[in-house]
Every structure is written in C-alpha cells, then in structure tokens.
Amino acid sequence: MQHLVIRRPDDWHLHLRDGGMLRGVIADTSRHFARAIIMPNLVPPVVTSADAATYRERILAAIPAGHRFEPLMTLYLTEGTDPDDVEEGFRSGLVKAVKLYPAGATTNSSSGVRDIDKAMPVLERMAEVGVPLCVHGEVTTADVDIFDREAVFIETVLDPLRRRLPDLRITMEHVTTKDGVDYIREHAVNLAGSITTHHLIINRNAILVGGIKPHYYCLPVAKREMHRLALREAAISGDVRFFLGTDSAPHVDPLKECACGCAGIYTSINSLSCLAHVFEEEGALDRLEAFTSLNGPAWYGLPPNEETITLRKQEEPVGYPAKIETEAGPVTVFDPMFPLYWTVIEA
C-alpha cells in the first residue's frame, strides 16, 4: 500500500509548554492534528478553569495562520481543587478532563497529589458529572523500583480508586507495561489507555546500551522488550480502549544533556511517519485510523474529525530535522533509529 487516507488524527496527550517554547513547537502538532488534550503541568500549573481559559488563549494566539487546531484543556488536580470549579469548567465546555500527577512523578509534578483521600471530594464530583480523570500511573515512593512504578500504581492506587468510584471515567495515560494493557482489557467499564509513539518503538536498551542517551529518557521510563511488544499488540488490535497520546514533551537540549536531565521526548514532528511504519511493520495499516483518529474521540465523547489526511510511502527515506530551534533554545527531535518512508502529503 503506497497511499493511506485516514480521518485527521488527534493527540490525546500533548505538552505544548508556554511562551517561546509554545510558539516554537505548536506548528508541528497543528499542521496535521485536529485536536489535542493539553497537559496542565506548567509553572505554575493550570489548576483552575480561569487558568485553563487564559492558557487556551495563549495557545490559540500561537497557532500559525491557516492551521485548524483545537486545544482541549485539562486541569491539574491538587488536594485543594475546588469541585464546583471543575464542574463549571466541564459544563461550559472549556475543561475536558482533570489530570492526576502523583507528586514527584514527572516534570513539574511537585504540586501533585500526595494523599488521594484528600482529593476525594473533587473525584466524587467528577464521577457524578462525568468528567474524565487522566492519570499518570506511577507511584513515587523510594522503595519501589522505577521500572515497577506502573504495576505497583495499578495495584495500590488505581484498582482501589476504581472500586471506590466505579462511575469515574479514567484514562490511564502513556501505558508502558503489559500489566497496564492487561488491566485495561480485564476491566472494560470506564477505563481506557493512551499509548505514545515512542513506547511502541523503544525499550530501555535504547536509553542505556552503549552509553546513556538522554533523548530517549522519558517518564514513565521505557521498559523491557516484552512490554513494548504488548503495547504494540494493543495499539494495532483495533480495541477501542486504546488510542494515541503522543506525550510529546519538548525540553531544550541543555536541560536534557546534563547530569540530571529532564524526562521527555519530542515526537510531534514525526509521530505520524513513525506510526505508519510501526503499523505497516505489524501488517495493520488498516487499523491505524482507529488508533489515531477514532478510538480517542469515542472515549472522550467527541465526534471523529470529518477532514482527512493522506499518508504516502516514498521510495526514499523522508527527511526531518534532527533539532528544531525555538525561542527557548534547541530541541532534539525523536530518532526512531530506522529510516522513515511514510509522510503526510495532504492535511
């Protein structure tokens, strides 16, 4: 197959940052994606509907002329989040979800939840109203190995929360383990999972073998090969509970290439080329549209996009920049470690 026409995709987990970084990266998403769930972990974080409204205006102002893109706003859950504000923001159409960051789990998560019981009033209201909860599914206690954080989170936090609030709709974001895939499949009600582009391609060897490679370091960290294969199987399965959330997360190179580098991989610019490669490799190009364009909208109660894009397979590898320049500084682009032949020719 040399051409593939799919509905215009959406990204159900995206970091745009703010200021000069926002202005430097947004075009790589808005060029091909119609909508994206925008992560709220700014400094300071997006904790109220008013915060979300002003951040949304900054995003809209940064979208290049001619690009049609809708940012879908989220709130950063804290132990003091106001249930009334969440409900009002959701009912107004501004707020699409609330994000749970366990404190210390990832970039700018220090304001996150340390005691889930203290967030129960807002979680109970969300269950009543139908507001989705997006979770960064890792525990952060020092006694848990970093490669086990997701599995332990499922057992000690997610499963008890779902039993306590069975009506709460939960997105387990950036699933990285077979444990996560299996848990979603075994619990069909009010639970879904997003999968990143890079976790379909790299395992932990990419970070550690032959020297430490900071541009493959992300959180949740890439796991063993068995987990990568489980993610691939889930992504290509057509199962409506799994959909694309790139977790594209730009950091300037000096903050990655240092003694204590930031977690995050920038994939917005070449995600669709990478995904077409993966799905072709798995003999599943006919299911790429479900993963990128259909399953996510169905989960979030939105219609799929009417517009389409066309992917074409070239005879020669497709070029993409090794870095992009932003007002904040240079950002290294994800290198999948294989040539890419698929490119978007219409959007």
UniProtKB/Swiss-Prot annotation:
Keyword Metal-binding on entry: yes
InterPro entries, per database record: Amidohydro-rel, DHOdimr, Dihydroorotase_CS, Metal_Hydrolase
Cofactor(s) the protein needs: Zn(2+)
Active site, UniProt feature: 247
Gene Ontology CC terms, in alphabetical order: cytosol
Enzyme Commission designation: 3.5.2.3
Protein residues bound to Zn(2+) 1: 13, 15, 99, 247
Xref: CDD domains: DHOase (cd01294)
N6-carboxylysine modification, residue list: 99
Leading EC class: hydrolase
This protein's UniProt keywords: Hydrolase, Metal-binding, Pyrimidine biosynthesis, Zinc
Metabolic or biological pathway, per its Swiss-Prot or TrEMBL entry: Pyrimidine metabolism; UMP biosynthesis via de novo pathway; (S)-dihydroorotate from bicarbonate: step 3/3
The protein's role, per its UniProt record: Catalyzes the reversible cyclization of carbamoyl aspartate to dihydroorotate.
Family note: Belongs to the metallo-dependent hydrolases superfamily. DHOase family. Class II DHOase subfamily.
Complexes and interactors: Homodimer.
The name this protein goes by in its record: Dihydroorotase
